[in-house]
Amino acid sequence: MSDIRHSLLRRDALSAAKEVLYHLDIYFSSQLQSAPLPIVDKGPVELLEEFVFQVPKERSAQPKRLNSLQELQLLEIMCNYFQEQTKDSVRQIIFSSLFSPQGNKADDSRMSLLGKLVSMAVAVCRIPVLECAASWLQRTPVVYCVRLAKALVDDYCCLVPGSIQTLKQIFSASPRFCCQFITSVTALYDLSSDDLIPPMDLLEMIVTWIFEDPRLILITFLNTPIAANLPIGFLELTPLVGLIRWCVKAPLAYKRKKKPPLSNGHVSNKVTKDPGVGMDRDSHLLYSKLHLSVLQVLMTLQLHLTEKNLYGRLGLILFDHMVPLVEEINRLADELNPLNASQEIELSLDRLAQALQVAMASGALLCTRDDLRTLCSRLPHNNLLQLVISGPVQQSPHAALPPGFYPHIHTPPLGYGAVPAHPAAHPALPTHPGHTFISGVTFPFRPIR
């Protein structure tokens, strides 16, 4: 690597960046022939940091900076490299060497360039780059994933009006990237404050994607070898938890956003012109469609978990993630109570109850009814939620039924002793003489009044 470095020092920034990609392509291609998963050591990473991210090796040296035109040319070089490299394994390891966080001063430059590269790949539809980015999102800590998601949202939802259509078109080009992008976005926008409510254009795009094909949010789960214990601090296998959070919290979060300002401790009588208020009906319909799609996906999970031999072993919706959600709902309900938000609270709790019931029935949420009772005990009363946390109703033994009979529906029968289901046959009753049929006898008919 030292010989390569000395040759690169004599080149200008752009040709050095192109040359280092060429050398590392040869290096990792040879490594992959001897080992299916070669270890990326320190040498290649340092070369990339010095000649791609312009971070000098010597601490005393001043970092170089590319101007805007040079940076655009560098992005084009990288886009073309990943497009022209036909071996996915080589692409993936080069992408990982470039953009895996190292915990050093180069990480800011690394993340900035990654956001611009993926944004360019979306604009010019470079599928290999999007596929590499999907893998990167899957194996990178969530704190970096939300930074990439934020960069894309800024570029396509905030910077240029109408550019969301460009982002929307990658649905058919790279569904795997779309799935990971949705997971990142739901981690970024958790509705904990007005600033963290997803932009309307972004919400509409995601709902359109999922409503068109609900299986989109299961792509990563269905195409990834999965262990029963998932690593902590990374993105979830599916965006289900984040989407449930959106659907459940949305009625309360949007009501909080419309909260009138206080004047000397009293609610102002003036009508405030909030740009979000006019979109309430549209957002309500979008969240309703999203909630329906999420329930449809949850209903299919039992089959998929069984096929992967993970039914009862892997909870795609962790109970630990439901705890903060319920606490947030309770806090919002208390906060909005003076504003007569009874309809919004009812809708929020209805959606929570439906999601919990379907998730438990499909095996996506592994917990007991007692866990749910404890969790939801402080929430406002809701009829549907009470039915869910109570579970199937067990009928009390009836005097007319034999002791061995129990009409169970969803719960197993109680463990009674070995009692025969029916008593012994009683002696035959005396027979009565048959009645002679007399033809021609009419019976009076009187209608019931």
From Swiss-Prot:
Keyword Nucleus: yes
Family: Belongs to the Integrator subunit 15 family.
Domain of life, per lineage: Eukaryota
Signal peptide (UniProt feature, chain positions): none
Pfam families: INTS15 (PF14964)
GO biological process: brain development; eye development; mRNA splicing, via spliceosome; RNA polymerase II transcription initiation surveillance
Function: Component of the integrator complex, a multiprotein complex that terminates RNA polymerase II (Pol II) transcription in the promoter-proximal region of genes.
PANTHER family from the UniProt entry: INTEGRATOR COMPLEX SUBUNIT 15 (PTHR14540:SF2)
Encoding gene per record: INTS15
Oligomeric and partner information: Component of the Integrator complex, composed of core subunits INTS1, INTS2, INTS3, INTS4, INTS5, INTS6, INTS7, INTS8, INTS9/RC74, INTS10, INTS11/CPSF3L, INTS12, INTS13, INTS14 and INTS15. The core complex associates with protein phosphatase 2A subunits PPP2CA and PPP2R1A, to form the Integrator-PP2A (INTAC) complex. INTS15 is part of the tail subcomplex, composed of INTS10, INTS13, INTS14 and INTS15.
Keywords for the protein's UniProt record, in alphabetical order: Chromosome, Nucleus
Transcription found in the keyword field: no
Lineage start: Eukaryota, Metazoa, Chordata, Craniata, Vertebrata
GO cellular component, one term: nucleus
Compartments it resides in: Nucleus; Chromosome
Name assigned to this protein: Integrator complex subunit 15
